[in-house]
């Protein structure tokens, strides 16, 4: 009785493996940036719930926008790379290629997002992306970054008028640590 169900399970697993391998090989035959067709084909296959066509349409538009932006950035980088290679070949006759190709079809979404962020950062002349830093509980927040040189000199007269208390408060702001105690902690503490 266990034999036919095991064989059936094995047959299903083998057919799924063959299906996945054939789909992966069909994707390998495409060009390196055929992601736009892959995105539209993925959305054409349909989602599991028919109640979210607006959500899938918005997701597809966002993905296509990111795709177009990525292709523009890659084209710019390729043009810059070709110009650099042309100038380098004039100086040095033989130089090994240092480019690295990325397979966007098999790239995980997080890696794709990080690559897109890095390309945006490189395109914006190496300026680091803005990151919001939140202080840890119980630590102090330095507010000196909020004050620039002009603002600090403008406030110097006001500081003397108040007696130095304003700048004292601006220099260090403490965040007290208050642990949240739920019902379980209150019950355990009451025993």
Curated annotation (Swiss-Prot):
Gene: Hug
Superkingdom of the organism of origin: Eukaryota
Functional description taken from the UniProt entry: Probably has a role in larval molting.
Keywords assigned by UniProt, alphabetized: Amidation, Cleavage on pair of basic residues, Neuropeptide, Secreted, Signal
Signal peptide: 1-24
Propeptide position ranges: 25-119, 185-191
Official protein name in the record: Protein hugin
Tissue occurrence: Expressed in a subgroup of neurosecretory cells in the subesophageal ganglion from embryonic stage 9 to larval stages.
GO BP term (any one): larval feeding behavior
Protein's cellular compartments: Secreted
A Gene Ontology term for the protein's cellular component: extracellular region
UniProt record similarity statement: Belongs to the pyrokinin family.
Sites of Leucine amide modification: 137, 181
GO molecular function, one term: ecdysis-triggering hormone activity
